[in-house]
Amino acid sequence: MKTQLSIFFVILILCTWSLDSKSKAPTDIKFNVYRNSSLIGFHNLSFSQMNNDIKAEIEIKFEVTFLGFVVYDYYHKNVEMWSQGKLKTLDSLTDKNGEELSCSVSKLEDSYKINGTSRETLSAETIIPTSYWKNELIKGVKKKTLNTQDCSVIDFTIESLGEKMIYNNKVLTDHYKLKGKESTGEDVIIDIWYDKFGRWAKMIFIKDGSEIEYISKKFDKSDE
């Protein structure tokens, strides 16, 4: 009887481990995006589970106006497939104020095929895209990332700035500063926050002298 019970509990533990080891789709993430405190658009990420893979669909829309005229328009659509924590495929299209950009990545047996506006190559390196939702991005002090707009490379240095309470002391986060340079030579300086579950919670960066701030729609009072 004791032997049968032991076997039963071993099987139960193995089955539980098997279920827990499968990838689970993260919670959807939605940001309102502000430029110098004025709302200019959104950045939404939705996730779904497909067998053991995770599908991430990312949509970004910015529109800056002046005296009623649109002076800057940006749209980005990106679909990523992840398997066992590794990027499997990525396909993005970007309209950057009239400039069309693209990036496509597919996992081969022992490398990645990369085809984008900036380059076409094979790479054996693990790819971390600049979609920011995976906190693998901030692990370590340096990280080579793939710009999801055009498949160029951004080398980031990463500084941990410690724990911070955000959204009126409602969310405890870890705060990081990323510094890098785009292929155009433009500096990239980002402040980014992840909550204690590793979920992307907030972001601020400077673009063309303006402060761009991402605020979670869940905590944005302007949505009330």
Give residue ranges: language-model regions.
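Bacterial N-terminal signal peptides
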Residues: I7-T16
